[in-house]
């Protein structure tokens, strides 16, 4: 593991040994310049880019790029690998996708809280790391989405949240790096803001909680895990939802 700078670049003191590779995450899909910096510093042949939060960012010339479309669309499973390495295609195809669909259907039915136990159960089935090809069901669902419409809506929602909350946000954001982001990273003033939003049915996910077991107190890594909220800005929502959420954030932060 290595340390990050406040703007999520690889810390200057990080050096690679001769046989090392570097895995860099494009956090929230807003780290285009930081990714380019990692490729320049360490060489594209030694860098693997994790685009699990940056679905709409094209894969650059590097060792490999990993994608997780299920973080962006209603898919039960499946990932994508882009690489020039001679990686053989899996001989086995995933056949368990139907069993992982229940929580997605419950969300469509308007009751995401009721589906949380099924979501946890579905996640546990993905702990099997045997390489398998994407299931037929997931492929068909994936092909049914309008990717460009989703990208445009995410960009519009992100910009609207930034217009409404940017002056309050402690996270420095470069809008030129943003293209189809996972969420809007918001650094708030109140540590209980996440719980308050969830209590009002605004789902704010927690990412990288395992980092707290190894990060130093008051480090950049601890700050991003505990204090930065990934406000939802995906294609399920529009202008009114963004206004309502921004107003709720402002109200909660100003209340005592």
What would you call each of these model-derived segments?
Residues 1-51:
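PLP-dependent aminotransferase-like
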Residues 3-9, 27, 52-54, 69-73, ...:
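Short, acidic/turn-prone active-site loops that include or flank metal/cofactor-
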Residues 8-14, 33, 56-61, 74-78, ...:
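Short, charged, surface-exposed secondary-structure boundary motifs
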Residues 23, 88-256:
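PLP-dependent aminotransferase class I/II
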Residues 50-58, 188-191:
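Short, polar loop motifs at secondary-structure junctions
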Residues 59-70, 244, 249-252:
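A short alpha/beta connector and helix-capping loop motif
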Residues 62-107:
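Active-site PLP attachment segment
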């Amino acid at each position: 593991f290595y340390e990050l700078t406040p703007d999520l670049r690889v810390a200057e003191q990080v050096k690679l040994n001769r046989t090392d590779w570097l895995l860099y995450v494009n956090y929230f899909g807003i780290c285009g310049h930081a990714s380019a910096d990692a490729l320049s510093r360490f060489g594209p042949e030694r860098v693997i880019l994790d685009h699990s939060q940056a679905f709409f960012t094209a894969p650059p010339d590097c060792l490999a790029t990993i994608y997780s479309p299920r973080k962006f669309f209603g898919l039960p499973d499946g990932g994508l690998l882009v690489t020039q390495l001679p990686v053989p295609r899996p001989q086995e195809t995933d056949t368990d996708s139907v069993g992982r669909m229940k929580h997605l259907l419950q969300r469509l039915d308007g009751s995401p809280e009721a589906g949380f136990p099924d979501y946890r159960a579905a996640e546990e089935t993905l702990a099997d790391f045997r390489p398998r090809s994407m299931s037929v069901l997931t492929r068909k669902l994936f092909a049914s989405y309008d990717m460009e419409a989703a990208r445009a809506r995410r960009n519009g929602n992100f910009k609207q949240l930034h217009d409404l909350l940017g002056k309050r946000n402690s996270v420095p954001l470069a809008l030129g790096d943003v293209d189809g982001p996972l969420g809007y990273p918001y650094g708030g003033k109140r540590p209980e803001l996440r719980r308050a939003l969830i209590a009002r049915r605004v789902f704010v996910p927690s990412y990288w909680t395992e980092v707290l077991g190894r990060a130093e107190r008051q480090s950049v890594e601890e700050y991003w895990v505990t204090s930065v909220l990934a406000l939802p800005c995906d294609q399920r929502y529009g202008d009114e939802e963004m206004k309502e959420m921004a107003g709720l954030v402002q109200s909660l932060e100003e209340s005592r």
